[in-house]
Amino acid sequence: MAPEGDQRVGSGDSDFVVVANRLPIDMERLPDGSTSIKRSPGGLVTALEPLLRKRRGAWIGWAGIPDSPEDPIEEDGLQLYPVALSADDVADYYEGFSNATLWPLYHDLIVKPIYHRKWWDRYVEVNRRFAEATARAAAQGATVWVQDYQLQLVPKMLRMLRPDLTIGFFLHIPFPPVELFMQMPWRTEIIEGLLGADLVGFHLPGGAQNFLYLSRRLTGANTSRASVGVRSRFGEVQVGFRTVKVGAFPISIDSAELDSKARNRSVRQRAREIRNELGNPRKILLGVDRLDYTKGINVRLEAFSELLEDGRVDRNDTVLIQLATPSRERVESYIAMREDIERQVGHINGEFGDVGHPIVHYLHRPVPRDELIAFFVAADVMLVTPLRDGMNLVAKEYVACRSDLGGALVLSEFTGAAAELRQAYLANPHHLEGVKDAIEAALNQDPEEGRRRMRALRRQVLAHDVDRWARAFLDALADTKSA
């Protein structure tokens, strides 16, 4: 009798399978009980779509609503395989273990992680369902790319079900320092789960080095000890007769598309309208973030408030726009954070604004893509001040939209993007005076200096786009077959 894992071998017909927590669609349940589907835009699907079409690709993920049907979906020529999650699954696996345990742990304990055995058990169970769905969809010898922190056990589970597959894993958030990761009660299980992959990818070499050390310490595996480079000099972990490759692959954006859209006449016109609606201030500062405690929105608001109070920023000719996309609205800590931020906005406007002319313009709602690009075109200074961020693509999006416009980027040192965007005004978000100095320098920079810096930033962003990121990872993954 064949081993249980072998029963699924070759049962699917997809040569390339992407596995992510979410499908690239938004599903909505209508009043009559039926469902509607619309395409969800994103850099990952944009980068992988040509490959998905060319290689009979499939995407495994959750459709976004509890108890959604598991029938395969064909959406705009893409083959999608939903994994159904119940309301309890969402509460324990997603809102619980993924976002109240892993998220804060991997973001340097900005808030305290919560360790619940029930959440962990559900995380294991849901990861198993994703692995089984992938095993059913993948053709013999297929390539599988697993995405992000919600699915860290899938590589090992899938390896046991389908040893014929070539499996890659990429972590889109920071991988924490060793001493923080060691707090995790299920630390060994996570590392062993990731070691089921043939290639484990991180944004930065530091994350790869942390993973190599933990693999040695927690599993006793032999690992390489030389430093890991960006898209080069890979680390290795010996797992039985397999060699797992470990690398750094900084993710990026579809920079050419953004560059093109930002030059569009209607977008430029809308950017002028935004400036007019704000009273044609001399300088517009912009923040664009998901409403999350890692993003440092409160830091930039406090810095801006103190600059106004100190008279280092003229309240009569400077405005700040803060776009905050709703996020995890049922989680208590996020509700409290939103209230704190809105209180800060109210304080600044009450102290420094005038009737009909607030100095901070705050929007707590999603903004259409073309409108967002118009904001990027309108803004003189972009504020990106996370306390910790794996990469931060907003910083790169702003740069891609600036073409002939100059401008300035204030960027937290604790973003992955800071390693690439060296011509930004870098600041430590934990040092308020440093953030204030960076904002003031960006506001007062010489126009020619601004154009020089922006040209350098744009060379980096336009040359290293999301397509190059995906190709670099998949080329390295393909090389593991011949290793």
Curated annotation (Swiss-Prot):
Keywords for this protein: Glycosyltransferase, Transferase
Binding locations of D-glucose 6-phosphate: 22, 94, 148, 328
One Pfam family recorded for the sequence: Glyco_transf_20
Subunit relationships: Homotetramer.
Homology family: Belongs to the glycosyltransferase 20 family.
E.C. number: 2.4.1.15, 2.4.1.347
Gene coding for it: otsA
CDD domains xrefs: GT20_TPS
InterPro entries: Glyco_trans_20
Pathway: Glycan biosynthesis; trehalose biosynthesis
Gene Ontology BP annotations: trehalose biosynthetic process
Name used for this protein in its record: Trehalose-6-phosphate synthase
Catalytic activity: ADP-alpha-D-glucose + D-glucose 6-phosphate = alpha,alpha-trehalose 6-phosphate + ADP + H(+); CDP-alpha-D-glucose + D-glucose 6-phosphate = alpha,alpha-trehalose 6-phosphate + CDP + H(+); GDP-alpha-D-glucose + D-glucose 6-phosphate = alpha,alpha-trehalose 6-phosphate + GDP + H(+); TDP-alpha-D-glucose + D-glucose 6-phosphate = 5-methyl-UDP + alpha,alpha-trehalose 6-phosphate + H(+)
Marked site: Involved in alpha anomer selectivity: 103, 173
Binding residues annotated for UDP-alpha-D-glucose, in chain numbering: 42-43, 290, 295, 393-397
Entry function: Probably involved in the osmoprotection via the biosynthesis of trehalose and in the production of glycogen and alpha-glucan via the TreS-Pep2 branch involved in the biosynthesis of maltose-1-phosphate (M1P). Catalyzes the transfer of glucose from UDP-glucose (UDP-Glc) to D-glucose 6-phosphate (Glc-6-P) to form trehalose-6-phosphate. Probably also able to use ADP-Glc, CDP-Glc, GDP-Glc and TDP-Glc as glucosyl donors.
GO CC list: cytosol
GO MF entry, a single one: alpha,alpha-trehalose-phosphate synthase (GDP-forming) activity
